[in-house]
Amino acid sequence: MLNDKAIRQSKIIYWSSGIVSICGIIFEVLFGALGSYILGDGVKQYTLTISLFLTGMGIGASLSEKFMRNLIIKFVWIEFCVALIGGFSSFIMFGITAFAPAGTDAFYLYSITLIIGALTGVELPILIRKANEIGVTLNKSTARVLFSDYAGGLIGGVLFVFLFRPYFGMVKTAFLVGLINLTVALIVLWLFRKEIRHFIVHAVIGGVIGVLLIAGLFFGEEMAFNFEQKLYQDPIIHMEESSYQKITVTQDEKDIRLYLDGSLQFSSVDEHRYHEVLVHPAMANVETPENVLILGGGDGIAAKEVLKYQDVKQVTLVDLDPAVVELANENRHLLEINEGALMDEKVEVKNMDAFQFLEDTSEWYDVILVDLPDPNNESLNKLYTKEFYSLVRNHLKPEGTLMVQATSPVFAREVYWTISETISSTNLNTENLHVDVPSFGNWGFVMASREEIDLDIMEIPVSTRFLTDDMMPALTAFGKDEDQQIPNFELKANTLIDPHLIQIYEKAWENY
């Protein structure tokens, strides 16, 4: 039968187990998010970080067999290490990305993931042994510590998704979680102080770590911002981290640029070239374009071009991230570019997944414009599949027209023609177009309809800055190094079952 002191100590151990588990899972998913943002390909990065973290836990658990005495002070020092290393992890990652040679950031991220995983793996066996040492039977100590650990894992994941990432960002989150680890260590240190030699020395060291973490919490994000500025050619004037992505706006004199997770979305100097080709051939191919659907395009620029047509009665814009739409409606630089298009009474904005929207809606559209980010992760890749384009076709009126941004036929030749082949596989007639956009390079589009498309007779009935009637046929001319005749490459449709486009995309862009 446990006495009151042993009961109190065992409760401390169980609570400590749950809290450090919360911290561990937050660090685990934080490293995945860091890898996804900085290195790209979210599925790959989350897979690697989770695997490395679990491997580290296994290594730590194996090493813990050597820890049989002085368990509390060993636990305290493990928490000190997790707090310091984990707390500064995001801050250092941004610094390495800005200043170190290519590849160093990946090596650092994977190393830090393994180290934090190993430290986390040591914690549980120590706590189980300590609970057993104070009188709790082994079966009870194991069950209760593991219960606290697993329950903490769920709580940590939920907290990261709904609290830490959207409200604190990656740098502050790491420092905050490090402070939580440190707090657990200091509480345990105090409550078990009678068992610990040189208590004051350990407490002072913990205090120093606390000062460093608090300094990082208040000043680290600003310094990391300066690191991140090195990744952009122009000064950053706006940066936020939404629930879905990091949104960055830069300015150099009159050049306003929007980046999502570090990928350029447009430059105000030449965006008209991109958006006019995206919008006007499709709109001009329909006699009376009354009902228009835009998938993506949360910056509002495509909507601005669509609203030039007097026949348009309804524009539905579907963009997953409400933060992008909010920025487009409130930032004075973006408002100047999109002319407040998203606030027009004809425009209805829906913040939801494009795939889900098409599954749910019963509407038919005269024109559908697909202005989505490139297929650089699994979530986006599904929006470049035969299944997705089949849904698009099913909501296209018989005489309607589809236009899809399809990456670069020069830099990502195989990607561009795979997207074209995928759209063709839905029994739509396609026309391939491309245009030079200085900030992007040569950029490609795929136009599709149930009817034959003839750009030779097409006329644009609205004002433009770049595109003319005479130019439209020229958009379909591809050079030998960018056409469909790709040596040693088999074109096949991208599907949900065989999502090979993402691998093609990674390979195409790895040198750019």
From Swiss-Prot:
Pathway: Amine and polyamine biosynthesis; spermidine biosynthesis; spermidine from putrescine: step 1/1. GO terms for biological process: spermidine biosynthetic process. Residues 215-450 form the PABS domain. Its EC number is 2.5.1.16. Spermidine binds at residues 275, 299. Residues 217-457 are annotated as: Spermidine synthase. S-methyl-5'-thioadenosine binds at residues 245, 319, 353-354. InterPro entries: PABS, PABS_CS, SAM-dependent_MTases_sf, Spermi_synthase. GO terms for molecular function: spermidine synthase activity; thermospermine synthase activity. It is a multi-pass membrane protein. Keywords: Cell membrane, Membrane, Polyamine biosynthesis, Spermidine biosynthesis, Transferase, Transmembrane, Transmembrane helix. GO terms for cellular component: plasma membrane. The chain crosses the membrane at residues 19-39, 48-68, 76-96, 108-128, 151-171, 172-192, 199-219. The active site is at residue 371. Its main location: membrane. Pfam families: Spermine_synth (PF01564). It is found in: Cell membrane. It catalyses: S-adenosyl 3-(methylsulfanyl)propylamine + putrescine = S-methyl-5'-thioadenosine + spermidine + H(+). Homodimer or homotetramer. Belongs to the spermidine/spermine synthase family. Catalyzes the irreversible transfer of a propylamine group from the amino donor S-adenosylmethioninamine (decarboxy-AdoMet) to putrescine (1,4-diaminobutane) to yield spermidine. This is Polyamine aminopropyltransferase. It comes from Oceanobacillus iheyensis (strain DSM 14371 / CIP 107618 / JCM 11309 / KCTC 3954 / HTE831). The gene is speE.
